[in-house]
Curated annotation (Swiss-Prot):
This is Ribonuclease HII. Keywords: Cytoplasm, Endonuclease, Hydrolase, Manganese, Metal-binding, Nuclease. It catalyses: Endonucleolytic cleavage to 5'-phosphomonoester. Residues 1-187 form the RNase H type-2 domain. It is an enzyme of class 3 (hydrolase). It is found in: Cytoplasm. Pfam families: RNase_HII. One of its GO terms (molecular function) is manganese ion binding. GO terms for cellular component: cytoplasm; ribonuclease H2 complex.
């Protein structure tokens, strides 16, 4: 069994990094899988439901902003992917990882640059991770509406930076990330 894993949320300046691990059913293909960044939100939502229904196994895990601050975004991403793979109810024979590094795993793993566009199982993981992270950011928006997380999902857009400057950071902002770090240095 081949597992694909990927993360979503390395670039934003707030919120968790979320990872998913997916083992697809070769006898039950899913049409339209691709890198989550190349799909519309509506398409990702639709595919996310189909992946959860048709995949043999899937799991989602994350690293929260405090962990990101403690160990940096790269290692937090690796930890989230490791947790997602370990949360599967079975041990895969091989794990394909999007990117150029592999997390510490108890099974063989291979890094594939651009794997979210070339490997169906990684694309599926990419979609699950992105949809879950976006949902979490909508929940954070309910708690902190002044940052408009519902619009930019915590990426450093001009509007988000403007709101960050106006209101200061909230508890889920990544204080070690440059726009937030600069703001805190000037307080």
């Amino acid at each position: 069994m081949i597992c694909g894993t990927d993360e979503a949320g390395r670039g934003p300046i707030a919120g968790p990094v979320v990872a998913a691990a997916v083992i697809l059913d070769p006898d039950n293909p899913i049409e339209g899988l691709n890198d989550s960044k190349k799909l519309s939100e509506k398409k990702r939502e639709k595919l996310s439901l189909e992946i959860k229904e048709k995949a043999l196994y899937w799991a989602i895990a994350q690293s929260d902003p405090d962990e990101i601050e403690a160990i940096n975004i790269l290692w937090a991403s690796m930890k989230a992917m490791q947790r997602a793979v370990e949360a599967l109810p079975v041990k895969p024979d091989m794990v394909l990882v999007d990117g150029n590094r592999v997390p510490e795993l108890k099974v063989p793993a291979k890094a594939i640059v651009g794997g979210d566009a070339s490997e169906q199982c990684i694309a599926a993981a990419s979609i699950l991770a992105k949809v879950e992270r976006d949902r979490q950011m909508l929940k954070w928006h309910e708690l902190y509406p002044q940052y408009e997380f519902d619009k930019h999902k915590a990426y450093g857009t001009p509007k988000h930076l403007e709101l960050l400057e106006k209101h200061g950071p909230c508890p889920i902002h990544r204080k070690g990330f440059n726009p937030v770090k600069r703001l805190l240095a000037n307080l």
